[in-house]
A protein has these predicted regions:
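Flexible coil/loop and intrinsically disordered segments
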Residues: 1-490
Length: 490
């Protein structure tokens, strides 16, 4: 039986000064069948469940399903208790509809539980009485098919959906719906920063194209590494330096991502790319313009299409540039990137900074002289491994980039030659501490030495440290000249 309840009783975490929020207690059978449900403010919640475009994919694992099944088996046994099974709260955004006409109930929080119970409903009772949810994400389709196969192999309880109680928290304002989506985590699948910025920007896309943009976003896959790189490029600026939150502090990390890539974006729908323009004038004064395609990593972003295409562009650039495979051609940029940044194991934190610098360079200058520039940038970034005795900490890497503003050198340079002047003039003093034992530092130097054919005076750690940088610079010059020769002297 439906009953109206108070906000304070069932939703104490919500701000009660927000208008347009209503609460109701009902059962899942009523929700699935889109029946009229009386709410706390005297109105009716009346609508069909729907997954809005900004929802993240269905991701519940077998382990999470198993926990739900155990709870349901324990409740729907022969000695079932007299009270109903409480599923928790579901946050919905009601679009249209009133006491007479059925509207749409967009699921803001509770998708994982609702979808899982809908699968159980289909296995037990078929499609009749189950919500007609549409999933646009290929990941959701794959997970649903996998979970259905898994559920078919389990001993399922006989579920009475009219005895599954749920608290509905309903808002009729889209801004409140997004705010709840951003802050909720009751389903056991934590919202990542990429999930939230997707939700934020889809709201600014015209409705006719929302599904297309949502599908495009889902096809990008895991955006966490890319978003972390974008955050570094936008935070590591000398004029407005901000440390980037560690992924070991997911709440602060998420807050920073939402602030930078959602809330601080400009309230317009113009898709603007800020690019440097080169004007070439011939002897007769005729101009020829040259513009690098794509977006600038640090550019201002507009809400909606602009930010979504910005992210998609850098996702594609990252794949093209840094997904180098297991055996890239020897002597290529991909070969040295893999050998020096991945295989040498200098530090995951240094590798992430290196990835940021490479993407910033490629977005500004393209791939011209990429190998040469990448090796000099490697020298600047990974010099920290030679400066430190053993450990390279995440906060230490941020301090290293702040003291040696590589990202600013890239962003402010007008040409590859100007950037190379910054890179070549960088000075540091390696230390031999840690090179006399089987340490990460020693293994890194040995790996770099093998890859670049450095002539180092092992096993003397003091001399190795003293001669390392000169050998490294000579190797970079030798490899760069060979690369220029391969390209016909260009």
């Amino acid at each position: 039986m439906n009953q109206a309840v108070s906000e304070r009783q069932f939703a104490p975490h919500l701000s009660l000064d927000v208008e347009g929020i209503t609460v109701a207690s009902t059962n899942l059978d009523n929700v699935f069948n889109a029946r009229k449900i009386p709410s706390s403010d005297g109105s009716c919640i009346f609508g069909s469940l729907n997954l809005p475009e900004y929802q993240r994919p269905y991701r519940w694992s077998e382990e999470q399903l198993a926990r739900l099944l155990d709870d349901l088996r324990g409740f729907f046994s022969t000695d079932a208790p007299g009270h109903d099974f409480y599923l928790g709260s579901i946050i919905l955004h009601q679009q249209g509809g009133d006491g007479r006409e059925r509207g749409i109930l967009n699921i803001i929080d509770g998708q994982q539980r609702i979808t899982s119970l809908a699968l159980l409903h289909c296995l037990q009772k078929g499609d009749k009485g189950a919500p007609a949810l549409e999933f646009n994400s290929p990941e959701s389709y794959r997970r649903i098919q996998h979970n259905l196969r898994w559920l078919e192999q389990q001993k399922l309880p006989r579920i009475d959906f009219s005895r599954i109680n749920v608290t509905l928290v309903v808002t009729r304002r889209e801004d409140d719906a997004y705010r709840f989506f951003e802050t909720q985590n009751t389903s056991g699948v934590r919202l990542g920063g990429a999930d939230i910025i997707k939700a934020y920007h889809l709201r600014s896309v015209i409705p006719a194209t929302q599904n297309d943009f949502a599908r495009t976003w889902e096809r990008l896959g895991d955006l966490k590494p890319l978003v972390a790189t974008l955050m570094k490029s936008r935070h590591w600026q000398s004029l407005r330096w901000r440390n980037v939150a560690s992924d070991r502090d997911p709440l602060l990390e998420r807050k920073q991502i939402v602030t930078e890539l959602a809330e601080r974006t400009l309230a317009n729908t113009a898709d603007i790319a800020y690019r440097p323009l080169q004007v070439h004038r011939d002897a007769w004064g005729k101009d020829m313009h040259s513009v690098q395609p794509g977006y600038a990593m640090r550019q201002p972003l507009g809400s909606g299409v602009n930010t979504m295409r910005y992210v998609a562009y850098f996702h594609g650039l990252r794949q093209t540039l840094l997904d180098v495979g297991e055996a890239p051609p020897k002597g290529s940029f991909a070969y040295y990137y893999k050998r020096l940044s991945k295989d040498a194991c200098g530090s995951v934190f240094l590798s992430r900074a290196y990835e940021c610098a490479l993407l910033m360079y490629a977005s500004q200058f393209g791939t011209a002289r990429l190998l040469e520039v990448s090796l000099w940038m490697f020298r600047v970034i990974f010099s920290m491994r030679l400066i430190r005795e053993v450990s390279v900490r995440e906060d230490g890497v941020q301090a290293h980039i702040r003291d040696n503003p590589l990202m600013d050198w890239i962003a402010s340079s007008h040409s590859e030659d100007e950037l190379l002047e910054y890179l070549r003039s960088y000075k540091y003093t390696p230390t031999g501490a840690g090179l006399d034992k089987h340490s990460i530092k020693k293994r890194f130097v040995e790996s770099v030495s093998i890859t670049l054919h450095l002539n180092l005076p092992w096993p003397n750690p003091i001399r190795v440290a003293a001669e390392y940088d000169a050998e490294l610079c000579a190797a970079i010059k030798r490899i760069s000249l060979a690369d220029i020769a391969r390209q016909g002297g260009k």
